[in-house]
Amino acid sequence: MAKARRRRVRDTWKEKKWYVIKSPKLFGENEIGTTPSRDPDFLLKRRVEATMRELTGDFSKQYVKLKFQIDSVAGSEATTRFIGHQVTTDYVRSMIRRGTSRVDAPVIVETKDGYKLKVHPLAITIRRAKSSQQKYMRQSIEEHLREIASEKTFEELVEGIVTGKIASEIYHQAKKIYPLKRVEIIKSRVLEEPA
């Protein structure tokens, strides 16, 4: 029986270059990480995650995960844009206790510069609330969040969401309806950018 001829395998790993990924201007253009690629065009639309602690050094914000997408490459640096954030599930679970109510109020908001975002606030009550109270609280949170977003630019809104300033505004407004333990914006996602 004839032996099959061995084909020479080309090592594509040697062709790859390393690119430094930078965070957007809003987060200080810090280095998030590095990634290999054969062609800079292959980097576009890649998604990267980083915690707030990695970007700011603030250990108290360890539970906030920021999501970025590479939108341009210049030389060996890839710049990103913010596409959303999420709070870790173990942090959310640690807030919820027996005898409390969890009020979720996801809402689509539009900023004054034309960005559309889906924002997911979570309110936790001190004691169990009636469904009518929860419904009223949900409506109040949604209205207040739409109002806040319409007055801010995209960067101001993202900064407020990530730092917790908007969550504290919502807390002070919603606690008038029912005593609250905590309000947190657990998730956000950019849906549309202005043309």
Swiss-Prot record:
Keywords assigned by UniProt, alphabetized: Ribonucleoprotein, Ribosomal protein
One Gene Ontology MF term: structural constituent of ribosome
Stretches assigned to coiled coil: none
InterPro entries reported for this sequence: Ribosomal_eS1, Ribosomal_eS1_arc
Superkingdom: Archaea
GO CC, alphabetical: ribonucleoprotein complex; ribosome
GO BP of this protein: translation
Family: Belongs to the eukaryotic ribosomal protein eS1 family.
NCBIfam families: PRK04057.1 (NF003142)
Protein name: Small ribosomal subunit protein eS1
Gene it is expressed from: rps3ae
